Amino acid sequence: MNTMRFHSLTLAALLALGTGAAAAQDFVIYVTNEDSNDVSIIDGASNAVIATVPVGKRPRGLKVSPDGTRLFVAVSGAPKCPPTMDDEECEKLEADLAADGIAEVDTATHAVLRVLPSGLDPEQFDVNWTTGLMYVANENANQASILDVEKGEIVSTVPTGLEPEGVRVSPDGSVAYVTGEVDSDITVIDTATGKEKGRIEVGLRPRDIVFSSDSTRAYISNEVGASIAVIDVAASTVLNTFALPEGSLPMGLVLSQDGQTLYVANGRARTVLALNVVDGAIKSSVEAGRRPWGLAMSPDGSKLYTANGPSNDVSVIDVASFTVIATVPVGSTPWGVWTGPKL
């Protein structure tokens, strides 16, 4: 595979880090809107929506290339089944398999350049920008697809726990973790071989994953378990489980830039929590919108952004005061949120 493009993207991102503090404010926030089939783009300085980009059906997971020129969005033709619908009724709904894929968007023109193959019902994914490989959770197929982004081809698939959702590649690129919601486990993929390395049992209904910057620890949000699992990556074992307050339903996770604080979007509990990574003690809590799901941080670490599905908006949280300083209306049922350079 020709990895020149991905090496250059990484180099461009590193060079951007040296452009000064002012450049840290020149960013945008991308928000996937699952029911309006588009992405809202919010200016990081003004907190105003500056563009809305149609991308395909049910956009959920998203990532931005290191140089900010490409936005990748998981789109899916799988029917949306609310929690109130029983399994038999859901199974009767017809899926639009042709709508499944990863949309690649030019962030300058907002044009969808191509839709990459993804496997059935892609939900979340992550990219190793050094190798150019993308790891995609195929929720309805109970597997992860490994995609060569440059070639636009699926190179292999890996069985996972039932209903995979969260995907994250470790910063050192050695492993990819995939959450299995129903099996309450993590499938560990060895990125060197593209094979399963093992499974780690965590709490009930694991959703999201974040690694420490040195790749020694991983934190998993267990939605139904109302907890955070802390994993020793080298040993593939759970070191600790942080119990969250009663009624918590943790979803999206972000680590502070110094690695000392874990931020948790608490779903239908309508809060965002700040936890001490050593003992899980709650440092701060703030009420956000209805069901904060996706969670992202500004490049300078001073702001958090939550995608609030039922309230169709994004909460902007000032990290220092841990208060909501703005609420930004977006599309219908915002799901995921990510930040990237403003070009």
Give the label of every model feature segment.
Residues M1-T10:
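Bacterial N-terminal signal peptides that target proteins for export
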Residues G18-L343:
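Predominantly soluble domains enriched in secretory-pathway, periplasmic, or organellar proteins
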